[in-house]
């Protein structure tokens, strides 16, 4: 474009009406961000590859992986450098615009010059404004030249700044024939599986009639089933000698546990164990304590034993034994007495537990009847003669 052929109104108007340098500044920031991301990605790739190859993944497969990924890492580094260059060029283009904008004549000045020229020409009746008109025209020519020079400089600077090196596409990290090889392997595997299935079905169909014929012969089937495999015979011969040991060590404890459970159930039904037995057991110590506490102190003596015939008795037996029934007419039983009363039983003795002794014979006076009404026997009084 020939900027010298355009008036200053056009050149200045374009510079002031455009978007300015903001888009170029934003583009420079975006290129910087892309360059930083590519650099970080390249460093991460190299770190992971180094760790895998030297520590965790060794062998030919690891080497092939490194050889496949190395070109891609190099491309990322080269692309990051190109992105940084693009950012620098965008900044240079923005700077060129700012320089041209500062050198261009502002449109208001151009408009004022044109307005003054129009006024001078209008009032130049006698030629008195000829010099002023020439000066105004010269000033306008300078504005024209200034705008043309600024635009030419801006065009050259922006052309250099916007010349970006084309970016190379990323390298292919896989073999071009890998897809075809994979498809061929899948097809071969599918064909092999289908062929194996078909052969298995054909074999099954071929053996099916013989199997059905064998099932129709019960005797042959039984004989075939009775044939013991060798491994089963070996297991039986190995297990029989130690089967009794397994029964004694494993079965008998369970048998004893079953007997114990049965006995516990029976004792609980009889009341020997359970809540009632627990209450009786809890009351037993108190009863024993009361019995022990009620006994008197231990005493001993010599020559004080009571006698029954030639038999000597302990002193407390005499008190524990019941009184003998008195005879009628004896000194101990007056004739005026009422029925014979049975003495109260004394405290239990130590040896025989207070067992009553046999009473003496009462044949002389007789004894009262033990049932019905008792007859009262009275002696003859002295005053009766």
Curated annotation (Swiss-Prot):
Pfam families: PPE, PPE-SVP. InterPro entries: PPE_C, PPE_dom, PPE_sf. GO terms for biological process: response to host immune response. Belongs to the mycobacterial PPE family. Was identified as a high-confidence drug target. This is Uncharacterized PPE family protein PPE22. The gene is PPE22.
